[in-house]
A protein has these predicted regions:
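Alpha/beta-hydrolase active-site loop
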Residues: 104-161, 180
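Short, solvent-exposed loop/turn and secondary-structure capping segments
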Residues: 44-46, 59-64, 92-104, 179-181, ...
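Solvent-exposed loop/turn segments at secondary-structure junctions
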Residues: 40, 54-58, 87-91, 172-176, ...
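The feature captures the conserved acid-bearing segment of alpha/beta-hydrolase catalytic domains
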Residues: 40, 68, 75, 190-239
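N-terminal cap/lid subdomain of alpha/beta-hydrolase-fold enzymes
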Residues: 47-90, 96-109
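A domain-start/cap signature at the N-terminus of enzymes
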Residues: 13-48, 60-80, 142, 148-151, ...
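Sec-dependent N-terminal signal peptides
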Residues: 2-12
Length: 239
C-alpha cells in the first residue's frame, strides 16, 4: 500500500510540474507540455529546448523515455523544456484500433517527388490522416502545418519568458521534423539535433543559412536507414 501511495504521489508531482498548454491552431485542438525549472524566473534570460516525439509517440512519452526523464536535464542545466504533441487519431485499419500520431515534416505527407515515389511497389501501407487530401499511397504523416504550429509555440513562450537561445531535437519522425524546422527557420534555432530521422528520397533539405546541426543514424537501422537503401517496410530515405 505504501508503494502504491508513493507512486501516486510521484505521478501527481510529475503532472503538477509539467503544464499542459492547449491552443487552437488551423481549427484543430493542439497541445504541448511545458516544463519550467523552479529556479527560472520570467525576467531571467534562459534557453528553450523543444523535444519532438516519433511516429505514434506522445509528448509525455518523449520526456519519460529520453535520458531517463528529459526534464531532469532541464533542472540540471537550467533551461525551459517544451514537448509538443503531434496531431493524432485512432485508426481502425486491419480491424484493430491503433493510436497514430506524427509530424508533417513536408516529406511523409507526400508520395511523389522529383526522384520518384517515396516507397516501393511492395511497401507497407500505413493509415492515412482523415484530413490529408491526395497524399497518395505512400503518405503516412499528418498534413497539417506543423512547422507553423511549433513556431507558434515559440512565439507564445517568448511572450512569457526571456528566451536566449532555442534548440530543437527529435527522434525518428520527430527528427525529420527537427530537420525540416532547421531548413524552414534556420535563423530561429541555435542548434538542431535529428536522431535516426532521415528524410525521404528526393525531399532531404539543407538549411540556406548556417545553423548548428547534428544527424545521428544507426548503422544497422533497417527502419530508417542512414544510407540510400530501401527500408524494411519498403520506404526510401536519404541523409
Amino acid at each position: 500500500m505504501k508503494l502504491i501511495i508513493f507512486l501516486l504521489l510521484s505521478l501527481n508531482a510529475y503532472s503538477a510540474l509539467h503544464q499542459e498548454v492547449e491552443l487552437i491552431y488551423e481549427d484543430f485542438n493542439r497541445s504541448y507540455l511545458l516544463y519550467v525549472p523552479e529556479n527560472i524566473t520570467k525576467k531571467e534570460k534562459t534557453d528553450l529546448v523543444i523535444g519532438l516525439h516519433g511516429y505514434t509517440g506522445t509528448a509525455s512519452g518523449f520526456e519519460t523515455q529520453t535520458t531517463g526523464g528529459f526534464s531532469k536535464s532541464a533542472d540540471r542545466y537550467g533551461f525551459i523544456a517544451i514537448y509538443p504533441q503531434g496531431l493524432h487519431f485512432n485508426s481502425s485499419q486491419n480491424d484493430a484500433s491503433t493510436y497514430i500520431s506524427s509530424w508533417n515534416d513536408l516529406a511523409g505527407s507526400k508520395t511523389n517527388t522529383s526522384s520518384g515515389e517515396i516507397c516501393a511497389v511492395d511497401a507497407d501501407i500505413y493509415p492515412q490522416y482523415p484530413n490529408c487530401k491526395n497524399g497518395g499511397r505512400c503518405s503516412w504523416s499528418s498534413c497539417n502545418d506543423d512547422l507553423g504550429f511549433v513556431k507558434r509555440i515559440i512565439e507564445l513562450t517568448k511572450n512569457q519568458y526571456e528566451i536566449k537561445n532555442i534548440y530543437v531535437l527529435g527522434m525518428s519522425n520527430g527528427g525529420m521534423m527537427a530537420q525540416a524546422l532547421a531548413c524552414e527557420y534556420p535563423n530561429l534555432f541555435k542548434g538542431v539535433v535529428n536522431v535516426v530521422g532521415m528524410q525521404h528520397k528526393g525531399l532531404s533539405c539543407i538549411p540556406n543559412e548556417p545553423v548548428n546541426f547534428i544527424i545521428y543514424g544507426g548503422a544497422k537501422d533497417t527502419t530508417v536507414p542512414p544510407v540510400k537503401i530501401k527500408s524494411s517496410d519498403g520506404y526510401f530515405y536519404e541523409p
